[in-house]
Structures are given as structure tokens and as C-alpha cells.
Curated annotation (Swiss-Prot):
Gene: aaxA
Assigned keywords, A-Z: Amino-acid transport, Cell outer membrane, Ion transport, Membrane, Porin, Signal, Transmembrane, Transmembrane beta strand, Transport, Virulence
Name of the protein in its database record: Porin AaxA
MF (Gene Ontology): porin activity
Organism: Chlamydia abortus (strain DSM 27085 / S26/3) (Chlamydophila abortus)
Family per similarity comment: Belongs to the OprB family.
GO cellular component terms, A-Z: cell outer membrane; pore complex
Length: 448
């Protein structure tokens, strides 16, 4: 069995190296439609777009001259590029690997200290330790195995989320200031296999089928309200605050893209793996599945590009999440000229899984506003969320909780950025004695 797997992998590698240069980007992530992990890869390649295209052309010529290569040739060529000749250069190493394997690789590392007020909970006598220190690492890989006019494109996509805390965690901060949401997207330590899929895109790039582990978080949102590492920090503005779907689970989905501006998906997942902490094929035999449908329209107008999407999903009752739910999420994002981007979201879910069962979001962002650095970004947004009284058991709670957040990302070269961030919670749901709560943070990003 081991010999068979080794032979199969060698064959896929060899075949992929012979035919892969036909596309620069995998078509299973449509260019005009938001995909959380694809955006990370796209961001990593923005600075090197010219180099990538020239490398692709050069590779095409090389492959035309050498239609057959040994499976170890990419390793030899990476070493021949000498990425560490003038000191260790992670970017140069990744560029060499990408060129030889027709893959895209990014690693994002974030350090996030956050200070919060009030400092102690309603019935607590001691202040919580400040600040909370969050460390967030997210590697992402997209590898094109093969590409031919008759077989189409086959690719493997991988993304992992690793979150750790030092001194104190965000859950204790949430309790101290009395909010039903969260001061960031991951309140405690997290290990999540967000994506590990094989995708087959058929000729004409209209139909794609994907198998493996994936999460709806990757498509549920727009450019800046769906990723704590690059946009807003607060729970209600960095994701769907009422989401009850899995953080990553095994299943499959079918994607139909009749035109570049239309993307339609339908799929299912194992219902048992709610946290996405493992990759478990056995759960598919236990006859509990979650289902979803998704439609996205990305018009191109004189004002700029936009995206309007709708997601509907249902989850089954399992021991890990003992409530059956139905949820929805409506999103829009629209560029208004070169520098201004407006976005919004309305989402909700039934059941008693989350603290918030409705959320309304409206915001704006301006990328590189003074043409100083491509990483520069200004953002301001507001979210009003309805509190789920069946989940929060305090005797006195507010029905709604509102957060206003603003941030400014300052880029230092292509790989480092700092983001001062301010969150103001108006009428925190679990602190009826407080009119407002405040959270200050500084996000430091290191990306390859």
C-alpha cells in the first residue's frame, strides 16, 4: 500500500511538471469572487506580479525544451537558485519553490496585544491581566498538480490556523468588559485545519468539483470583514458573528462558473467535526451531514469592481453541537473609485449555538490612500448584533450590542506592517451597568 501511494505521488508530480504552466492561477478560486485563503496568496504575490509572470513564461520555455523531467529535478533547481547565498531569504526560497512546483505559498504571522476597559468583570474583585497577547500563524499553499486541455486542472489547497495566548486570553477580556461578541476572532487557543482539498476544474473553467476538508468561512464575507490578520479585529467585524457552520470539515462541493462574474456553489460536509481540529474521513460514514448553497455576482462597472453574495446553510444535531440550525449570510462589497471600498453584511441563524443570532454590518475602507505602500489601509465599520437570550444566561442583559471599530494599517516594505486599532462597544450586552467598553490593540503582521 505504501509503495502504491509513493508511486501515485511520483506520477502526479511528474505529470504536473510536464503540463502545469498553462495557467498562472488555479481556476477553482474565481478571480472576481472573494475567497479568504486565496486572498492571502494573492496579497503575497502582489509585489512580485511582474516577476511571477516572467517566471511563468521562462518556465514554459524550459518545459517546452524538456517535456520529461526527473521527479527530483525541482529540488535540484531550488538548490541551484541558492536562496540562502546572501543570507537567509524566506521570500527568495518560497519564490524558487513556487517556480519549480507551480505552487503558491504564503505564511502570515501576527502578534496582537490588546488592552481593555473596564478591567474586571461585574462580580470580580481583581483586575484581569493586561494586555492579552495573541500569536496567530497561518500557512497557506495552493499546488497545481496538472493542467492539460483534455483533463483540465487538478490542484491541492491547504490552509491551517494556529492561535496561542500569553499572560491572558481574549475570553477573559470578553467577560471583563461584558460583551456577547469578542474582542477578536479567536478568544482562546486554536488548532484548525481550515482547508485541505483536491479540486478538479474541467476544460473551459466552468465546472469545478472539490473533495476534502474546507470551511464556509473562506467564502462568507468580503475583502476586509472576513480575516482578522488583514482587516477588522472584533468578532462581529472579522467574520459572520452568528455562524454555526464548521471551522473545517470533510465533504465535497460543486462549483459552477458560467461567466467570470457569476459563481454558484452547493456542497455538503460531515457534521461531527465542528472545530476543524482534525481530518476524519470516518465521520462521513456516520450519516450526519451539513449542507449549503452559495451564489455570488461580481459586476464590473465604471465605478469599480463589486461583489454581492448570498449563503444559506443547515447543520445537523450532533454531540459536538447538540442543536440543529439554519443560517444565512448576505454580503456586499463595492469599490467606489480607486481608493474607496464600501461593504455590508446581514447574517443570522436559528438555534442556541452562538451568543449572537443576528448581525448587521456596514463599513468602508481605503487601500493605499496616499500611494505610500501597498499594505497601507484605513478602515471604519459598525456592527449591531442581536443577543441570543437562550444562550446568555445572565439575569440582566441587553437585547442588542453595537461595536464601532476603526484601524490604520501602516506598511513597512512588502512584508511587515503595524495596525493600531480601536473598538468601542456601545451598551455591552452583559454589563448593563456600563454604557460603553473600549478595546485598544496594535497588530504586528509578518508575511512572506
Amino acid at each position: 500500500m505504501a509503495s502504491f501511494r509513493s508511486s501515485l505521488l511520483s506520477a502526479l508530480c511528474a505529470y504536473g511538471m510536464m503540463v502545469m504552466p498553462a495557467y498562472a492561477i488555479d481556476p477553482n478560486h474565481p478571480k472576481l469572487h472573494h475567497h479568504k485563503y486565496s486572498e492571502r496568496l494573492k496579497k503575497r504575490h502582489t509585489e512580485d506580479s511582474y516577476l511571477s509572470s516572467s517566471s511563468t513564461l521562462e518556465s514554459s520555455k524550459t518545459f517546452a525544451q524538456e517535456p520529461r523531467r526527473h521527479v527530483l529535478t525541482p529540488i535540484r533547481n531550488v538548490l541551484a537558485d541558492r536562496p540562502c547565498e546572501e543570507g537567509l531569504s524566506i521570500s527568495k526560497l518560497f519564490n524558487s519553490i513556487e517556480k519549480e512546483t507551480n505552487s503558491q505559498i504564503s505564511v502570515d504571522f501576527t502578534i496582537l496585544p490588546q488592552w481593555f476597559y473596564p478591567k474586571k468583570g461585574l462580580l470580580k474583585a481583581v483586575d484581569e491581566k493586561q494586555p492579552t497577547w495573541q500569536f496567530y500563524v497561518s500557512p497557506n499553499v495552493s499546488w497545481q498538480l496538472y493542467n492539460s486541455p483534455t483533463a483540465g486542472v487538478g490542484s491541492i489547497d491547504f490552509s491551517y490556523t494556529l492561535v496561542r495566548y500569553w499572560r491572558n486570553n481574549a475570553q477573559n477580556a470578553n467577560n471583563a468588559i461584558g460583551i456577547a461578541g469578542g474582542i477578536n476572532d479567536y478568544s482562546t487557543r486554536t488548532n484548525t485545519l481550515s482547508q485541505l482539498t483536491f479540486s478538479q476544474t474541467f476544460p473551459e473553467n466552468i465546472l469545478t468539483i472539490s473533495f476534502g476538508q474546507y470551511s464556509l468561512y473562506s467564502i462568507d464575507g468580503t475583502l476586509y470583514d472576513n480575516d482578522q490578520q488583514s482587516g477588522f479585529l472584533s468578532y462581529a467585524l472579522s467574520q459572520n458573528a452568528s455562524a454555526t457552520y464548521s471551522s473545517g470539515s470533510v465533504g465535497a462541493y460543486l462549483q459552477f462558473t458560467p461567466t467570470p462574474s457569476i459563481n454558484i456553489q452547493a456542497g455538503f460536509q460531515d457534521a461531527y467535526n465542528v472545530s476543524g481540529s482534525s481530518f476524519d474521513l470516518y465521520n462521513l460514514t456516520r450519516n450526519r451531514y451539513n449542507f449549503y448553497g452559495y451564489v455570488s455576482w461580481a459586476p464590473q462597472s465604471s465605478l469599480g469592481s463589486g461583489q454581492y453574495s448570498a449563503l444559506v446553510y443547515s447543520t445537523r444535531k450532533v454531540p459536538e453541537q447538540p442543536v440543529q440550525t439554519t443560517g444565512w449570510s448576505l454580503n456586499f462589497g463595492q469599490h467606489l473609485g480607486e481608493k474607496l471600498y464600501v461593504f455590508g453584511r446581514w447574517n443570522g441563524a436559528t438555534g442556541t449555538v452562538t451568543n449572537l443570532n443576528r448581525s448587521y454590518v456596514l463599513g468602508l475602507a481605503s487601500a493605499n490612500p496616499i500611494n505610500r505602500n501597498p499594505q497601507d489601509l484605513l478602515g471604519a465599520a459598525c456592527s449591531m448584533s442581536k443577543v441570543n437570550p437562550k444562550v446568555i444566561t445572565e439575569k440582566k442583559i441587553r437585547k442588542y450590542e453595537t461595536v464601532i471599530e476603526t484601524f490604520a494599517t501602516i506598511g513597512f516594505g512588502p512584508h511587515i506592517s503595524l495596525t493600531p486599532d480601536l473598538q468601542i462597544y456601545i451598551h455591552p450586552a452583559r454589563r448593563p451597568d456600563k454604557r460603553a467598553a473600549k478595546v485598544y490593540g496594535v497588530r504586528a503582521n509578518f508575511s512572506t
